[in-house]
Amino acid sequence: MARIAGIDIPSDKRVVIALTYIYGLGNKLSHKILNELNIDQNIRVKNLTEQQLSALRSEITKYNVEGDLRREVTLNIKRLMEIGAYRGLRHRKGLPVRGQKTRNNAHTVKGKPKAIAGKKK
């Protein structure tokens, strides 16, 4: 297994697919990186030379990935909560942030339904 950006990349997969295992690198960005480095997209990770791996590592350091990206996202959410923005309030309450309706669905964000004590017979 090759180690890039602190992540063990599976060696039996194609390079394009294996790069998407890194948080912050999607399909489009992995294609772009491989085109810039002139690396064949269909080659397996185990068949990469050490020179190609080092070029990949140096190219990926240019992008905001893994821990830095996760930290940036959490700080952005924390900032929204501190300034009292509407999105921050939704994050704080654990509700959908992007304008979805909550009357029916949104159970993945809200959690399991809580039982309400009914009227006694």
From Swiss-Prot:
Which NCBIfam families does this chain map to? uS13_bact
Describe the subunit structure: Part of the 30S ribosomal subunit. Forms a loose heterodimer with protein S19. Forms two bridges to the 50S subunit in the 70S ribosome.
Keywords assigned: Ribonucleoprotein, Ribosomal protein, RNA-binding, rRNA-binding, tRNA-binding
Q: Which terms does the record give in the GO molecular function aspect?
A: rRNA binding; structural constituent of ribosome; tRNA binding
Q: What is the lineage of its organism?
A: Bacteria, Bacillati, Mycoplasmatota, Mollicutes, Acholeplasmatales
Q: Which GO terms describe its biological process?
A: translation
Spell out the protein name for this chain.
Small ribosomal subunit protein uS13
Highest taxon of the source? Bacteria
Q: What organism is recorded for this protein? A: Onion yellows phytoplasma (strain OY-M)
Provide ranges: composition bias, Basic residues. Answer: 109-121
